[in-house]
A protein has these predicted regions:
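Active-site recognition of the HExxH zinc-binding catalytic motif
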Residues: 70-82, 315
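Short amphipathic C-terminal alpha-helix that caps PH/PH-like domains
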Residues: 76, 129-137, 249-253, 317
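Short secondary-structure capping/junction motifs at helix and strand boundaries
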Residues: 126, 138-151
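Short, intrinsically disordered, charge-balanced linker/junction segments flanking boundaries
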Residues: 306, 310-318
Length: 318
């Protein structure tokens, strides 16, 4: 292609002056054109997969390595979806579940990242989902209403003056359930024991024993640090006006932020000099027998997920 204006497949990127093109590739296996962009002002990174799939997908994600096991990434994932500047309702997520035409709607906390994915085949619905999620992550009501943190994270409860003080909270109770499952306990122990000197040694979802150690200010500081476009990854997929979506992202949100360095690097674990053994107890019910109720796991680190062929090979084996 020649001339001042280049047409990259489905997009005229020369008109999108707010973005820098980092790479483009035809993805023949999925009949798509792929683009990697960077928003010049904020530093946000965007992956665009343009094709004729009517099921449109959007997500924004942030690297959120936990510094402890208080579950702050998980609590923030819950709480940013409890109202925002543009959508000041108690629970926008529930409203979307009830009234949206979405084909997928969720928010997911991983050991090192938090993502907010949505999908819809309806153009107007898809745009609304994007708007609700972008406003939720960048302008949540958590700074105005401390009770959101207490409701979703943890708080003390006293049913009556003679009752004992108890701890309650959506994430707190969710993780109590997760930590009662032997399979979940083993999965967490594997990750923690293989990478003891990294953020993977901590529980991003929150350990019920440590969740009550999280303060409101620590929680807000985590959001201020990591929920910035400079630390974000945005993904757009499907049959849509990509130029329009990118302009909207720029004008409504990304251009309101300056590029700031965010230290969210995921450090590699130094290899062990010898094999290690870890033993941990887990809870069983009074009806269960301890006999034949033991789990054994042998684990090795074989590389990183950035090695595409190695990663795919082990996905197949799994």
């Amino acid at each position: 292609m020649t001339g001042q204006e280049r047409n990259y497949g489905f997009m005229k990127l020369s008109e999108l002056t707010a973005y820098e093109l980092l790479g483009e590739q035809e993805l023949k296996d999925i009949h798509s054109m792929g683009y990697i962009l960077r928003h010049k002002k904020s530093g946000a990174r965007i992956t665009v997969i343009s094709n004729d799939d009517e099921n449109k997908v959007f997500y924004i994600g942030f690297r959120t390595p936990p510094e402890d096991s208080t579950g702050v990434p998980h609590i923030i994932e819950h709480t940013v979806l409890c109202g925002s500047d543009k959508y000041p309702v108690k629970d926008p997520f529930v409203e979307l579940v009830k009234g949206s035409l979405n084909t997928f709607l969720n928010a997911i906390t991983y050991p090192e990242k938090t993502i907010y994915p949505v999908a819809s085949c309806n153009n107007a619905d898809f745009q609304n989902l994007m708007s609700v999620y972008m406003d939720a992550v960048f302008h949540p009501d958590i700074y105005k209403h401390r009770e959101i943190f207490e409701q979703e994270g943890w708080h003390y409860e006293l049913e009556d003056e003679d009752a004992p003080v108890t701890i309650n909270g959506v994430v707190y109770n969710e993780m109590k359930g997760a930590f009662s499952s032997p399979d979940d306990v083993l999965e967490r122990l594997i990750l923690n024991s293989l990478f003891p000197d990294t953020s993977y040694a901590n529980e991003s979802g929150g350990d019920p024993e440590h969740i009550p150690e999280l303060t409101y200010e620590q929680y807000l500081d985590f959001h201020r640090k990591y929920y910035h476009p400079s630390n974000s990854y945005i993904y757009l997929y499907g049959d849509m006006d990509m130029e329009e979506k990118l302009r909207w992202l720029d004008e409504k949100y990304l251009s309101h932020f300056e590029n700031e360095p965010v230290d969210s690097e995921i450090h590699l674990q130094k290899p062990f000099t010898e094999m290690r053994e870890v033993v941990q107890n887990y809870s069983i019910t009074s009806e269960e027998s301890e006999e034949d109720n033991t789990y054994l796991s042998y684990n090795k680190v074989v590389g990183t997920s950035l090695d595409e062929k190695l990663y795919l090979a082990f996905e197949i084996l799994d």
